[in-house]
């Protein structure tokens, strides 16, 4: 059995873990000769989940100021404030620039690597940690953590290869449950619980929500589901799902009703995919939808195809279009359903029309405005951790000091990143949470270590 001693051990080589390593090494190296900061990553290389972020482009932060940024953080944005001000979005861009990665900013204050390659973000994070003196060890699957208050080195971390790493401080940054193929399998929740921490209810967020009839859900597939309302993304599309899949709606309104009450509404882009309703506003609404479904509530999505037009004005416009079609000699001998299709081509994307007709069989030129302003879809489920962007819930932030991210229950233990009961909307918020909390945890662990050794 191989024993290795370190000053600080960081479990997890994702966004939070790499930033914790950089912050810890930078801080400790200024006060101590030959500090040893070790990152233990179970995957063959670090930053696996970052690599798939933003379809490989990696929207790594958002440049909104704190007042606007905090509106996109759940459930208690105030907890993030000390971490954010220690490492703001602007500072993160400078941080990456200092190790050779330039950025660009696109619509919605979203920042991307100038190369549009997520791998550049990972490479920059690894460089920053290693330049500061941290060691990143891959293929190191942690199987046990022991906290021994009487020992000089308070933490003993055992890996599957029988190697044991001991340290004064331990930072756990193992991520959540989303995209388990990248290594996020929820290990950190168990370790946190073993050390006395409570875990707030976990559920998928920033995921596809599935309308009734969108997928061929069978009793057998329901039995295989891991949680109430979970519909595996691999479940085949139904006839309706196939008609809708691939449609991308621009500048529409989306309202979510929970048990008949309006819960939220958004304006923007909505996509029908092989998973269900996605896109920026679909993802943003998913948090409330999933939570409601898990708790047994009825969820309904209402799409406003013409949010910029009042229904009265839309009715006038449609009546005018209908009269023009009726007067057109080319329509004189056409059946009503064919003239109605012509009308639909003037108010809907062509690709969407077959699905719209099938799902709204009673719509006609008189009721079309009402249907366009309120296309209702009852929601039966959601895509789970296999393809959700982030895990909501996590280690209770009530048990963690926000100014240091140290455990209130176990001295010398720190948490950062998705493992915390802290998550954001789509748009770069979740990676910034990971960067800011990871960096502060690393700095705090080093500062505490320095103060204890003076």
Segments and roles (model prediction):
Residues 2-16:
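Beta1/beta-strand and adjacent pyrophosphate-binding region of the FAD-binding site
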Residues 9-11, 40, 142, 164-181, ...:
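Short hydrophobic core segments
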Residues 45, 66-68, 76, 85, ...:
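Residue-level recognition of phosphate/Mg2+-coordinating polar/acidic sites
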Residues 169-217, 234:
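Glycine-rich loop(s) and the adjacent beta-strand/alpha-helix scaffold that form part
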């Amino acid at each position: 059995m191989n024993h290795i001693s370190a000053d600080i051990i960081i479990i997890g080589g994702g966004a939070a873990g790499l930033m914790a390593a950089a912050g810890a090494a930078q801080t400790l190296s200024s006060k101590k000769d030959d500090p040893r900061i070790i990152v233990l990553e179970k995957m063959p290389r670090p930053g696996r989940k970052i690599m798939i972020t933003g379809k490989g482009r990696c929207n790594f932060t958002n440049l909104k100021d704190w007042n606007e940024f905090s509106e996109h953080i759940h459930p208690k944005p105030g907890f993030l404030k000390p971490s954010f001000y220690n490492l703001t979005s602007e500072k993160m861009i400078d941080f990456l620039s200092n190790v050779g990665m330039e950025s660009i900013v696109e619509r919605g204050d979203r920042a991307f690597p100038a190369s549009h390659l997520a791998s550049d973000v990972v490479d920059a994070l690894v460089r920053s940690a290693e330049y500061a003196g941290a060691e990143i060890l891959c293929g190191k699957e942690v199987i046990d953590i022991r906290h021994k208050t009487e020992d000089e080195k308070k933490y003993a971390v055992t890996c599957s290869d029988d190697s044991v790493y001991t340290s004064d401080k331990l930072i756990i940054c193992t991520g959540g449950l989303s995209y388990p193929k990248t290594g996020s399998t929820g290990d950190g929740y168990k370790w946190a619980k073993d050390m006395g921490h409570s875990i707030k209810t976990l559920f998928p967020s920033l995921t596809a929500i599935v309308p009734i009839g969108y997928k061929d859900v069978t009793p057998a597939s329901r039995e295989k589901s891991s949680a109430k309302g979970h519909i595996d993304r691999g479940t085949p599309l139904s006839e309706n799902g196939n008609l809708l899949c691939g449609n991308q709606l621009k500048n529409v309104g989306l309202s979510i009703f929970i048990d008949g009450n309006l819960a939220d509404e958004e304006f923007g882009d909505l996509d029908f995919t092989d998973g269900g309703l996605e896109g920026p506003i679909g993802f943003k609404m998913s948090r409330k939808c999933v939570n409601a479904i898990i708790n047994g509530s009825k969820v309904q999505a209402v799409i406003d195809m013409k949010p910029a037009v009042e229904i009265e004005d839309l009715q006038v416009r449609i009546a005018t279009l209908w009269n023009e079609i009726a007067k057109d000699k080319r329509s004189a001998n056409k059946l009503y359903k064919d003239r109605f299709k012509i009308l639909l081509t003037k108010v809907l994307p062509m690709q969407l029309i077959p699905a719209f007709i099938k799902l709204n069989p009673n719509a006609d030129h008189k009721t079309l405005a009402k249907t366009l302003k309120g296309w209702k879809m009852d929601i039966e489920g959601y895509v789970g951790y296999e393809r959700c962007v982030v895990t909501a819930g996590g280690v209770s932030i009530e048990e963690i000091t926000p100014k240091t991210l140290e455990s209130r229950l176990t001295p010398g233990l720190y948490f950062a990143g998705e493992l915390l009961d802290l998550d954001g909307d789509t748009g770069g918020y979740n990676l910034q949470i990971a960067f800011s909390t990871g960096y502060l945890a690393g700095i705090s662990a080093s500062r505490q270590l320095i103060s204890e050794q003076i």
